[in-house]
Amino acid sequence: MKRILFLITMIVSAATADAQFVQVKNGRFMREGKPYYYVGTNFWYGAILASNGQGGDRHRLHKELDRMKAMGIDNLRVLVGSDGERGVQASKVEPTLQVKPGVYNDSILDGLDYLLYEMQKRKMVAVLYLNNSWEWSGGYSFYLAHAGEKNVPTPQDAGYQKFMDFMAKYATNEKAHQLFYNYVRFILTRTNRYTGKKYKDDPTIMSWQIGNEPRAFSKDAIPAFEKWLRKTSALIRSLDKNHLISVGSEGKWGCEGDMKCYERICADKNIDYCNVHLWPYNWNWARKDHLSEDLERSCQNTKEYIDEHLVICDRLNKPLVMEEFGFPRDDFQFALGTPTTVRDAYYKYVFSLVADNAEKGGKFVGCNFWGWGGFAQPKHEMWQVGDDYCGDPSQEAQGLNSVFAGDISTLDMVKEQVNRMSRINH
């Protein structure tokens, strides 16, 4: 009898522990045994802000987390850390976490620990991305350089087309992959010095994400790209059986326009849910001097893009999260306090697409707007060392896509969406 009671206790304890982690059941997110629909944001600089070194400001971190939590935002998408030497290129986020392969900045690691500790206290969860196809945090270009590639270009010097053509080498560079896998092993086997929990046992982490907008960068590289994603997801699963895994893909735009590629990378048995990103200005749906006039086209293209991906999510029975979307401020201004009329209209439309689908039992279960600027006070149009971090990384104008604490009309709309999503219980 005692043995039976012991086994029952163990089973119940295991089920309770599992329920603490965000899970996917029948194409939906579940958190603590309840359906989880959410409005989150991108807080890429969270680990830097939480650090005790350069760039760290824990007083501001607490204010930002408290403000977000008060609004009902409980899902933050965060960069684990930037890669590379400091002071090499103006467009890269500093300070970096991985200075050279296997050489780490303990201050940023401490910051990541502290961020998760503070998020845990507020019952928030994090989506942590490990790589980046773009130069602003190192990523592909960092690993290629340390795998022996010479004269690795930056978009600022060579232009984006030459940069992307060069980055296509990453998909087939096995040495670069091995350097990245070493990094994955290091991060996923870490123990948080503030909570004493191993990362793999911490429910504050919702998902490990392979990268920020991973791309093949050429149609010829797609097979190798897909193979790399599969190997990475399998590695993550071998190290961590508790957490969700996601790709971080933009969708069709990140798959060289190939929806079959998107379906294959989402169908991977180790990938738990699907992602899309939406960038009307970056994708030439909206022109900087005609933002208002191009709003209707941006909304129409957004709906078509989402619908196309939802078909695949329905087929795979996996949830969809739009984990990045943004729109410039009116008249392409950047300064604090400048109007956000057109942005607000775009946000309102995007939010309606998410909630309308979720309320009908669809697979569209959440979104993270880009990005949280909060209480930042940018000093320069382009970020310089010592400036506040905001939603726009260092390669972009500060304020371009940031939502600041003073953007009341936008934040009110976010709160309305939070309330609407929180009422969905199926």
Label each region the model flagged.
Residues 21-288, 292-320, 325-425:
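Active-site mouth of glycoside hydrolases
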Residues 17-19:
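Boundary at the C-terminal end of the N-terminal hydrophobic targeting segment
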Residues 4-13:
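Sec-dependent N-terminal signal peptides
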